[in-house]
Amino acid sequence: LHGDDVTDWEPDVRAKQGMFLAFQYPQEIPGVTVNNFLQQAVSARRGEDQSVLDTRRRIMGWMQRLEMDAKFAERFLNEGFSGGEKKRAEILQMAMLEPDIAVLDETDSGLDVDALKIVASGVRAVKEDRPEMGVLAITHYRRLLDLLQPDHVHVLVDGKIVASGGMELAQQLETDGYEAFR
């Protein structure tokens, strides 16, 4: 991150320095609303308290872009959320936190076709607003890549990059499987 090895950094330090991680299975945080969570997270990321009104306006704007009901902001974070709602909540967090790099760990896991399209559209919207932001999308399936249209595709086997290329590599992986890369 910015030329530094972040391996030994604590998660909060990574986040404050501009790294965002969307989890495959986001945790529920009972008692903390989406709105309050984002207010605190944005203030922590920027290193100073943020205007509640301005933050709320940004939240509502992004929620609209992500096709989320405004009532969503008052729900407890991830509590009782569907898989698609959890993923959209994470994309909302990514949009609000404005990271330098976003790591999306199997963001497509458990999503139906419609939810996947909304999430991918949200990632693209954040990327359009912040073209300098890097996105590392980790997936086992090509469908997310088809929607995101990444600049580069890398195949990892046993924790090592064994091939790099473009979308043609994703097609080859889908056709031939991981065994072709061992």
List where the protein language model places each region.
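ABC ATPase NBD Q-loop/coupling interface
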Residues: 1-14, 78
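Q-loop/switch helix immediately C-terminal to the Walker
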Residues: 21-25, 31-46, 58
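Hydrophobic anchor residue at the start of the ABC signature
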Residues: 90-91
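ABC ATPase C-loop
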Residues: 94-95
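Walker B catalytic motif
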Residues: 103-107, 114
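Helical segment within the ABC ATPase nucleotide-binding domain
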Residues: 116-131
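Conserved H-loop
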Residues: 131-140
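Conserved beta-strand-loop-alpha-helix hinge in the C-terminal portion
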Residues: 156, 160-182
